[in-house]
Amino acid sequence: MAMGKYSRVDGKKSSSYGLTITIVLLLSLCLVGTWMFMSSWSAPADSAGYSSTDTAKDVSKNDLRKEEGDRDPKNFSDEKNEENEAATENNQVKTDSENSAEGNQVNESSGEKTEAGEERKESDDNNGDGDGEKEKNVKEVGSESDETTQKEKTQLEESTEENKSEDGNGNEEKAEENASETEESTEKSSKEVFPAGDQAEITKESSTGDGAWSTQLVESQNEKKAQQSSISKDQSSYGWKTCNVTAGPDYIPCLDNWQAIKKLHTTMHYEHRERHCPEESPHCLVSLPDGYKRSIKWPKSREKIWYNNVPHTKLAEIKGHQNWVKMSGEHLTFPGGGTQFKNGALHYIDFIQQSHPAIAWGNRTRVILDVGCGVASFGGYLFERDVLALSFAPKDEHEAQVQFALERGIPAMLNVMGTKRLPFPGSVFDLIHCARCRVPWHIEGGKLLLELNRALRPGGFFVWSATPVYRKNEEDSGIWKAMSELTKAMCWKLVTIKKDKLNEVGAAIYQKPTSNKCYNKRPQNEPPLCKDSDDQNAAWNVPLEACMHKVTEDSSKRGAVWPNMWPERVETAPEWLDSQEGVYGKPAPEDFTADQEKWKTIVSKAYLNDMGIDWSNVRNVMDMRAVYGGFAAALKDLKLWVMNVVPVDAPDTLPIIYERGLFGIYHDWCESFNTYPRTYDLLHADHLFSTLRKRCNLVSVMAEIDRILRPQGTFIIRDDMETLGEVEKMVKSMKWKVKMTQSKDNEGLLSIEKSWWRPEETETIKSAIA
């Protein structure tokens, strides 16, 4: 019965045998054809014997790579060709051995298989003999595809070399001397740039099935082909143009919005010097002054700068007799004087110290605010006493005074004491200085002096060096009387009044109280105390109020205890952090320490040695997302200064930065920064752009970075790979140089040098036409 049964089955099979064979062959051909198509795109690396780790390395080094022209062509190309030849031979041996096997035998491969490859193999096994030849043909196609990929890579290297030789002013060639050295150090520095894992982990990628998703290899090949169409295509896609504005090369979008300024009802409180950002941030690039040169290095820049970089002579004509600034051939020179210190800033600095030794420059007093700074010689020479002075003044009050300061390499920013709070937290400055700063402190209930009181640390000093202190004419005497009444009502203690006989000036030194006793004993509540709901740290676009915040007396809260002496304070976590949770989720002291150690490692072992940066050319630095200020702290021993920026939508860690003896500012990166073009030598952005892309136009952000970064300046960005890819396209479209790349998992780093290139086509910004 059994035999008969099987006979009936065999009979049925015979009757439909031809149809079955046809269907099987068609399915086999479809599967083989599909596999051939996929392997021509996604299989070369695996076919050639690469592991998935090798594939990931190829992707990371090409998607986020250093400029190819900086590599050693022989080492790169020859090594790849040798690997491909060896892999092709290996494939041929494997194919021959597979052809001798039985049709139902499961073939084993030394390389990893994709799911698509395994699916094809199972189908081939079921088809029996004869499919080995098909498999051989498929592998030969894969080898040809791999050779094609290698040719594409060589063409891309040649194309990149051609693009790198283009430069608007011819100055780009200087930076290429260090490029090859930078590439050699890329692999070496990976552990320091990403200290949490070793080198193998940086490029580790598991081999997974492609499914419906595009692989990294396909994406990288497509990107290579797109880049081969030349940088000019990217330029047209981003449409860069040079800004046509009244301010020309000095354009500051939020301070040169003439449409908004003309609509102001009054300028009594310097409203025209405050921020009025255009509705849409500009996408254009600011022009360079004729004859602009790379800035003179510090400390020579403190004494002289190139005239063509800041071509303004009005201040030299007005203040030349006070030793502010003088013309000297192709330079502007700064003798180190000022309105209050004609005989030099250092003498004046020592005069203040001698007037009240408790100030203790560079020890107790580390971070100060200089109001109405002139050309900032006071702040420039305080570096000799290990003091950081952040100077500010309004735009054009004296022609380009802040621009002079920044070109000299002295910390300064544009701001005005008008209708809004200064962009600093409360109780952060150790000392505030005003030398003939022309601010009417005593009017309108002392509103402006009360703003200084907000920013001044309890126990901090206010040094007022102005004519009412040492002159007795009717006007000055009236101001002195009003100031005396106001400061007494504010409970400020007049510590001393001293006269400098050499400069024939004087200074009054006041101290802010460290408790609320005096406030509670005042016969009248004038100036009034602020409401308990008023946050003294709220400073972004907050209107000024004529009130005083109570002093914190709880020792577990910030402001109750003076920070450690400098330099101990820079590495010591503030005691008041104990009750808070850190930015990264750990207890704040642990967060603080971990952040500090991380940046110490990255800066000392990677940034300083392996990034190809000439740090002797770096003076003005900005950390665009500072968190705890660890990056700035790691650079404290270098002859530079760092502007730490805490974005307005980030955790408010700026008070911690000040507590460390560093300084910074709040800012919204969807808007323009309050500084002149070409301010900074180096910009650092750690995971900033991936947060900005949610609410800002990244093209506008890059235009702003181009505006404030000097030609040949460095931009270091750390972020996720998607964001870095977008930024890399933008900077290349502006002809910037990607000097170094690094990646680990989905995180990466780019070190980029700004070019001198400016677009020929212009764009008129209507809001910036006076």
Swiss-Prot record:
Domain of life: Eukaryota
All ranges on the Cytoplasmic side of the membrane: 1-17
InterPro entries the record matches: Put_SAM_MeTrfase (IPR004159), SAM-dependent_MTases_sf (IPR029063)
UniProtKB keywords: Glycoprotein, Golgi apparatus, Membrane, Methyltransferase, Signal-anchor, Transferase, Transmembrane, Transmembrane helix
Keyword Nucleotide-binding: no
Enzyme Commission number(s) of this protein: 2.1.1.-
Record-level Gene Ontology MF annotations: methyltransferase activity
Protein name as it appears in the record: Probable methyltransferase PMT25
Lineage summary: Eukaryota, Viridiplantae, Streptophyta, Embryophyta, Tracheophyta
Composition-biased stretches (Basic and acidic residues): 55-79, 110-124, 131-177
Glycan-bearing residues: N75, N107, N163, N178, N244, N363
Compositional bias annotation for Polar residues: 92-109, 205-220, 227-238
Region (Disordered): 44-238
UniProt-annotated location(s): Golgi apparatus membrane
Topology in membrane: Single-pass type II membrane protein
GO-annotated biological processes: methylation
A Gene Ontology cellular-component term: Golgi medial cisterna
Entry annotated with the keyword Methyltransferase: yes
Organism encoding this protein: Arabidopsis thaliana (Mouse-ear cress)
Cysteine pairs bridged by disulfides in the record: none
Family indicated by similarity: Belongs to the methyltransferase superfamily.
Membrane-side (Lumenal) residue stretches: 39-770
Membrane-spanning ranges: 18-38
